[in-house]
C-alpha cells in the first residue's frame, strides 16, 4: 500500500471512529485487572497475531524487575550514523567507568597487526595467567562499539586474565568480511606469543555473531583453534529469522520493534555476499572440530532464536556446546553492572573460560 493510500485509509478510519466513539474504556493497570481471555489468532498465512498479559516475574532480582517494568517509547527518532556512534561511545565510556569502579583494571590503547585494540589488564593479574589471553569482539550492530569495555572489564577481572578487545573496522564503510579479517589478523599475531590452547575468543550480540564467523574462518584457513569460544546473544544465519526477532525489541516487550522483512539481516554489513555464505552464516557450514563453546541468552532476547538455533547446530556437529538461558531478561543484559543477573552471567562466562584454559 503506497503512502498516500495509507494516509487516506487512516483518515477514513479516524473519521469513522470519531462518529461512533463512546466513552473511552478504562485500560487495565495491572495484570490481575486484564481480561481473562485470549484474543490471539492465526491468520490465513499462518502468522500468529499475539495478545498476552505478561507480568514481571518474581523469578528475577528486584533491580531487574524495575528495568522490565520501565516502558520505552515505541517510536525512535531518526538518527544519523555519526550521532549513533557518538552516543554509543558516550554510553560505552559511562558504562565502562561504572564497571571499572567494581573491577579495577588498567586499559591501554594499542595496535596489533595494524588493528586498533583495547588491552584490559585486571588488577592483581597472577603470574600463572600471564601466558593466557582472552580476545573480545565487541557488540554494537557492526556499525559502532557498544561493548569493548563492558564486555571486557568484568570478564578480565573475574577470570583474572588479560583481555584484548578488537576495534575492528565497522560497516557500512567496511562491510563483511572486513571485521572478520581484522579479528583473524589479531588472532594470528597473538599466536606468535600465546599457545592456541591459552587463547579464548568471545563476544556479545554482533560480537557473538563475529565470534562464530571468525571460528568458521579459522577452520577454513586451517589455523589452530583457540581453547574455547563464547557466543553470547547471537545468530549464525543471515538468511532466516526465528520467532524472537518478531516478538522482542532491544528492550524485550517494550520499545521500538522492527519485525523481520524478506530482506536479509543487516544488508549494510552483508554487502553483496550470499546470506548463506558459510563464514557469514556459519550455520550453513561445517562446524565439526570447533572448540568448546558457551552460549548465553535470555527469554526476552531478540536474538534468543538465533542463539538456540546456532547452539543446536553446534551440538549436531559434535561440538561441546553449552547453553545458559536467563529468565525474562532482555538482549545482552549483562552490560549493566547494577543487575545481580549481570554479575551472575559474567561469572558464568569467566568460569567457563578459566576451566577451558586449564586453570
Set out the residue ranges of the language-model regions.
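Short, linear, compositionally biased motifs with a strong N-terminal bias
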Residues: 14-16
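Sequence-pattern detector for short linear motifs
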Residues: 9, 55, 87-88
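Bacterial N-terminal signal peptides that target proteins for export
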Residues: 1-10
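Phosphate-/polyanion-interacting regions in eukaryotic proteins
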Residues: 76-93
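Alpha/beta-hydrolase superfamily serine-hydrolase fold, recognizing
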Residues: 19, 23-43, 51-78, 97-359
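Basic side chains
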Residues: 6, 84-85, 118, 169
